[in-house]
């Protein structure tokens, strides 16, 4: 019984050959996603800090409900003072039982943020998402400053292509 090791260059070459024979662009993109997945970093696919939909820790419950009702996101970073200091992640589903209330201490429903460095490889990141059972990571630069966020959906889309949901 003989075993062999296939490296990424051989897979890339096989993909090039396959691309001439496969007519379906979705199939080609899927194969390309598999090949390039492990080479990409969190910073390659993250949503930059200027695009992060977030909530201030100082927001009232009414303001939070108003903001999430206008949002397409189910997990929202919460910051203190500015986006550089993310203190938690709010899961919209955690507020559903309290949505009819006029006032609620929503801060007690915050979840611990998960931080990763911008050079975190996607193949490692997807394993951490799975292990920690979370869907959102805050991406930090080399100085520890927030530079963006990346979701599990973003990582999966690198393999399978765009996932269209009710908000896309």
Which residues make up each language-model segment?
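Soluble cytosolic regulatory domains appended to membrane proteins
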Residues: 4-168
């Amino acid at each position: 019984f003989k075993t062999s090791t296939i490296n990424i260059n051989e897979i890339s070459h096989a993909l090039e050959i396959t691309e001439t024979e496969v007519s379906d662009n979705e199939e080609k993109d899927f194969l390309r996603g598999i090949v390039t997945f492990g080479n990409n970093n969190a910073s390659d696919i993250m949503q930059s800090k200027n695009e992060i939909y977030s909530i201030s820790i100082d927001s009232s419950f009414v303001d939070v409900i108003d903001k999430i009702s206008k949002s397409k996101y189910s997990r929202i970073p919460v910051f203190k003072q500015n986006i550089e200091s993310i203190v938690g992640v709010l899961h919209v589903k955690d507020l559903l039982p309290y949505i009819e209330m006029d006032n609620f201490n929503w801060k007690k429903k915050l979840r611990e943020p998960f931080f990763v460095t911008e050079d975190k490889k996607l193949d490692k990141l997807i394993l951490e998402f799975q292990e920690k059972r979370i869907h959102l990571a805050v991406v930090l630069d080399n100085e520890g400053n927030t530079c963006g966020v990346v979701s599990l959906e973003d990582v999966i889309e690198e393999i399978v292509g765009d996932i269209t949901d009710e908000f896309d």
